[in-house]
């Protein structure tokens, strides 16, 4: 799956359109049980509301750096509603803690700065990398596998990362792919006497998709579940190979916000114990096998 993520800005919908969107509590978009209201009534969650009184009734600001289909994206039925794995989990986390949440959008490459500076309280699931851990902490509960997006028919015959030599990869600025995966593969290519991997740096995933569609890029690497969903929604594209990554994915929270980190960790433990996260992973396309025991990093 991909987490550095990671962020698919739906074509034609800008981040500013939904800036400041109010809490997703207003309309749950998944049928999975236990639902948000169920967690609000659980004894374990009532205990957490007592343990973290400063969060009860608080509006938690969720920063978004674009949209990633399957993780967080405007609903096709009602674009004013953000749906996906992250909103489904945020609904349950905030309900368990007696809090509320709202969304604000911006550029992906400044998302962590927004969280560490306090402009946002928490972000969507992202790759947990050593570089990011220098700036931010995480509450992580998933393992990562990248998928790929190609033009229909795979005209460049790209079947694995080894086929990226001499090709152009679209990558979002600040993403794991841009900072690590592509540079490392390019180094392997040149060491083998092959052409380097070119990188087309863009500001969000929507631009990456458009780059593949227009031919400016040969491939886009993103979370595996998102890659499948993107290709399914756009008949000019197809999903390709996958890459296992030695990375977990988690919610970024400021290092100095120990209360929120501890509260989210505790709430996620309740959610995992209920079986809801595995069900949500299957429902939104990431696959329940990606779940790992929730941990705090950083």
Cite the ranges covered by each PLM segment:
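Ligand-binding clefts/hinges and TM-proximal coupling segments of bilobed small-molecule sensing domains
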Residues: 31-50, 176-199, 235, 239, ...
